[in-house]
Amino acid sequence: MSFDFDATVVGAGAVGLACGRALARRGLSVLVLESEPHIGQGVSSRNSEVIHGGLYYPTGSLKARFCVEGRRALYAFLDSHKVDHRKCGKLVVATDEAEVGRIEAIFRQATTNGVEGLEHLTGPQARALEPGLNAHAAMLSPESGVFDSHGYMLALEGEIGATGGSVVVSTPFERAEPLSGGGFRIVAGGEGGATLTSRLLVTAPGLSAQAVAARIEGYPVERIPKGHFGKGVYFRLTGKAPFERLIYPPPIAGALGTHYRKDLGGQAVFGPDLMFVESEDYSVDPAKAEVFAGYIRRFWPGLPVGALTPDYAGIRPKLHGLGEDQPDFQLHGREVHGLNGLVALFGIESPGLTSSLAIGEAVSEMLTHD
């Protein structure tokens, strides 16, 4: 049977585009469908734009593996495509004796995960690197950084196009049904949308992962994990902060904690926090500035009064609720849902952006060896 496309990807964020690129590099004809008017308008555009080292994630997890592999691949990609980035390094800071044990546990986990160049630092050593920092002790991850995530996604889109693939925006996925001889019939484009056939199907739509999976005929409903919206807001600093590196506290339950970064334009940004919400809401409550200031002054006592201004908010596609353990990425192949030629992605939150190239390769491997 002939198909319109070898592979169709739902979602043109960083992960969907990375999946499309990986499949196109294997010689497949690729179509990427995006419901928004532009690529990367969802989770991929409302985050910290941090390149994570791979410090925190449990041994053997997909997050641990993909973050380290993806980070190495990402730096190489950014270099080769001349996408702006800065490998500034990260300090994870213990602000008192009680947090030192948590820093040591992160160091052990990161070492097990294969993260390179880690260093234990005393308080004076940390302050020598970053004057103004309140640090009882710290660990340095020199492989962490920041980058232009939109420039990265444009480069991915360009690679897909260069191989003859297509990224089509303003074209929402409506439904799909398996064909008797293999492959899928897909309807996309809203009311009166187009119908196409594809041998392979990848769903990577971020916050709508559960809704998209439910519109694939034959996908077992009980196999679709429950999704949660984890909202995080960011505040920017009026004026300059004295730090060049990323500054992180020890992680909190379900998130990495409210951290500092200097973006590529030199702007100091703090965030995100974590609040579970029922629907997409990207407002930022200015009253949260004082709460943020309390977090920040733990590692930067010199934060000026009234210096924080609301910046933006993002929502993470979480697979856990308040007080629940944070699960791994989920890549559902045939062994989960029973449908040949389909990989559905769920819960691709942090470190999904850093991991995107590795996720793309893994998905491509799953489909071409299915």
Residues of each region from the PLM?
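Dinucleotide-binding Rossmann-like beta1-alpha1 core, especially the glycine-rich loop
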Residues: 49-125, 135, 257-258
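Active-site substrate-recognition segment that forms the wall
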Residues: 22, 51, 83-86, 194-195, ...
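Helical element adjacent to the flavin cofactor pocket in flavoenzyme catalytic cores
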Residues: 139-200
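C-terminal lid/capping helical subdomain adjacent to the catalytic/cofactor pocket in oxidative enzymes
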Residues: 22, 26, 326-370
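Short beta-strand to alpha-helix junction loop
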Residues: 58-69, 93-102, 140-158, 168, ...
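Glycine-rich FAD pyrophosphate-binding loop
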Residues: 25-46
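N-terminal Rossmann-like FAD-binding beta1-loop-alpha1 element of flavoenzymes
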Residues: 5-32
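Glycine-rich phosphate/pyrophosphate-binding beta-alpha loops
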Residues: 56, 144-146, 252-255, 343-356
